[in-house]
């Protein structure tokens, strides 16, 4: 097949493109090469020469229409992710581009084998918790006043008792930030229009994806990037809150395995799938993995800072995708080792950490507990 990969010069998109080429498919990439992922408007050197590359915006109707007419399937990875309060841009890039994609498919009566849309674990927000008294709970975003007082764990909204984190299934949709809201909107556009108009669609809710090619320039996202850059430079990273917040890390090669599976397996059509690591890992545990990779005995600092809007815990339930035969095979240590090796060949690292830290503080993302 000839397959269009939007955002194909990025992290997940480029790895997926590589695998598709290895499987004998032809790959067409559409990417705007915009910051913070890319700098200088130049395609990254890791792109394979076999790909047919177009620099352009996925919202460019004429360009997108011309490309869609020539392909048999689509992976839609192009997205906007940041912590800036650009609410309209989140929806415009993530939701409107997806609506345009389906509009063209329907108008042109294109018979595509598959459209795979990249969603995010952020669509689930804090996810699902269990209270021994009141049962399942879906807490909202933690109030600023609570975080400023240094209270991290979420009490039951009904009885104020303790809550236990649960693995969150796909039926839960409770986004708490503009990015998560836009990804849920994207899911709804893709899955519902796909069902209505007979477009074989799959939406993939990725957890925190780790591995080589994750941009070093994104100030907000990427625990692997942040911690590896610190220890590589002999600096000590910061853990927010108490370092015990749980995250769900998945290796990019496992993600690619899942992406290829849903292209090939018709049982995936019309569904949303969580794509996660399946194992809860605290931020403190993850930074210890990075410490071991760099042979450091200097633990991260815990200075009583937090990022307003962060979830306390989140773990995706990957049962649904596992029923199709997929399971994550790589560990966080595998991801860290691969990323650390990749960093050795990156030359543009001077000032990256300082710029990112300054940006986070100037925007008020990082805040201190009240004394």
Tell where the protein language model's regions lie, with residue ranges.
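Conserved active-site helix of classical SDR/Rossmann-fold NAD(P)-dependent CH-OH oxidoreductases
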Residues: 98-99, 184-191, 224-228, 257, ...
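C-terminal substrate-binding subdomain of Rossmann-fold SDR/epimerase-dehydratase oxidoreductases
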Residues: 233-371
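A conserved pocket-lining segment of Rossmann-fold NAD(P)-dependent short-chain dehydrogenase/reductase
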Residues: 160-177, 199-216, 226-250, 274-276
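Short aromatic-enriched loop/helix-cap "lid" or pocket-rim segments at secondary-structure transitions
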Residues: 39-42, 126-131, 214-218, 286-288, ...
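N-terminal Rossmann-like NAD(P)+-binding domain of SDR-like oxidoreductases, especially those catalyzing
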Residues: 1-206
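Hydrophobic pocket-lining residues that define ligand/cofactor binding sites across diverse proteins
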Residues: 105-109, 194, 231, 239, ...
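CheY-like receiver
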Residues: 66-70, 104, 230, 258, ...
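Residue-level signal for the nucleotide or nucleotide-sugar donor/cofactor binding architecture
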Residues: 59, 85, 93-96, 170, ...
């Amino acid at each position: 097949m000839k397959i269009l990969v939007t955002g194909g010069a990025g992290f997940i998109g480029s790895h997926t493109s590589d695998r598709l080429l290895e499987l004998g498919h032809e790959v067409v990439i559409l990417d705007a090469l915009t910051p913070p992922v890319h700098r200088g408007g130049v395609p990254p050197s890791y792109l394979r020469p076999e790909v047919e590359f177009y620099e352009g915006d996925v919202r460019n109707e004429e360009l997108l229409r011309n490309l869609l007419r020539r392909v048999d399937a689509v992976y839609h990875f192009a997205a906007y992710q940041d912590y800036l309060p650009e609410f309209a841009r989140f929806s415009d890039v993530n939701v409107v581009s997806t609506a345009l994609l389906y509009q063209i498919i329907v108008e042109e009566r294109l018979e595509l084998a598959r459209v795979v849309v990249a969603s995010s674990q952020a669509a689930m927000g804090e996810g699902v918790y269990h209270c021994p008294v009141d049962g399942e709970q879906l807490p909202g975003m933690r109030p600023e006043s609570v975080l400023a007082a240094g209270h991290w764990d979420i009490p039951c909204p009904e009885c104020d008792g303790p809550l236990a984190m649960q693995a969150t299934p796909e039926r839960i949709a409770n986004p708490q930030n503009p990015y998560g809201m836009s990804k849920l909107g994207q899911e709804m556009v893709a899955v519902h229009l796909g069902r209505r108009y007979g477009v074989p669609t799959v939406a993939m809710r990725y957890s925190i994806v780790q591995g080589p090619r994750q941009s070093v320039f994104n100030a907000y996202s990427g625990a692997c990037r942040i911690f590896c850059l610190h220890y590589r430079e002999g600096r000590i990273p910061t853990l927010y809150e108490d370092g015990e917040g749980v995250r769900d890390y998945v290796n990019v090669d496992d993600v690619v395995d899942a992406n290829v599976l849903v292209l090939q397996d018709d049982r995936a059509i019309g569904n949303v799938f969580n794509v996660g690591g399946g194992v809860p890992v605290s931020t403190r545990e993850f930074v210890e993995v990075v410490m071991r990779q760099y042979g450091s005995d200097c633990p991260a600092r815990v200075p009583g800072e937090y990022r307003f809007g962060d979830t306390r815990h989140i773990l995706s339930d990957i049962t649904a995708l596992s029923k199709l035969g997929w399971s994550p095979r790589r560990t966080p240590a595998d991801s860290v080792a691969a990323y650390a090796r990749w960093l050795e060949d990156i030359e543009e690292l001077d000032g990256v950490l300082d710029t990112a830290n300054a940006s986070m503080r100037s925007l008020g993302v990082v805040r201190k507990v009240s004394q």
